[in-house]
Amino acid sequence: MTGPQPPVYGTARGPLARLASPLAARARQRRHAQFFALTGVAQGAKVLDVGCGQLGLRALEPEMDVTGVDVLPQPGYPGPFVLADPAEGLPFADGEFDLVYCNSVIEHIPPARRQAFAAELRRVGRGWYVQTPAWSFPVEPHALLPGAQWLPARWRKHYWKLGAAGGWEDISLLRKGELEELFGGPVFGERMGRLVKSWISVRRSTHREATVREGVDVVGEADHEEH
């Protein structure tokens, strides 16, 4: 059962965002099915949603035991919520959660703070699911502009304004090897056609379903050789 769905593109603007949103919504549903297959997490597991925003994982699984964490207040969040910056420390015990869920968040963390951010997620979770858009994918997903992430900063700041309402300075997409360094393997590739659209680092939850859900196409960690 799913709840109300948040906007797919919170930063991109213009007609391309409207055209891309239905495709992205379907991709999000497929990714969510993969979430269960990859992690083996049970409905009764205790989950921490890092960078939850207004709904986060609760939009897709409103009945799960989910605690939200965000650096910004989320007064309408439908469940337990903690205002905290993981890179500065989280108010939870070691291994307090069966799984830490972090979807399209780590690319917003400054590179110098990512080691501390990742270490805290690994500390509080017995398992984790960390997804981030792939640097190698030809369309930057926050601005929906081709190749925006590959441009030098002096050009990117002008190009970015064509597609995004927010600033570009706080977004730095990751390569597969960077995610591996932060969380270790395995790292899986989420594909769009023949291209890897995002990288997903997984450590399987210790609180698992008895059987993995059927009918889910899980892509392998060796699907792409980018490092």
Task: List each model region and its residues.
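C-terminal lobe and adjacent flexible extensions of AdoMet/dcAdoMet transferase-like proteins
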Residues: 195-227
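Conserved class I S-adenosyl-L-methionine
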Residues: 127-154
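Short glycine/proline- and acidic residue-enriched helix-loop micro-motifs
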Residues: 17-21, 159-169
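Class I SAM-dependent methyltransferase Rossmann-like catalytic core
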Residues: 1-40
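Conserved SAM-binding loop
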Residues: 36-137, 203
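Conserved S-adenosyl-L-methionine
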Residues: 185-195
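Short alpha-helix
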Residues: 165-185
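A conditional alpha-helix N-cap/helix-loop micro-motif detector
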Residues: 28-29, 110-111, 172
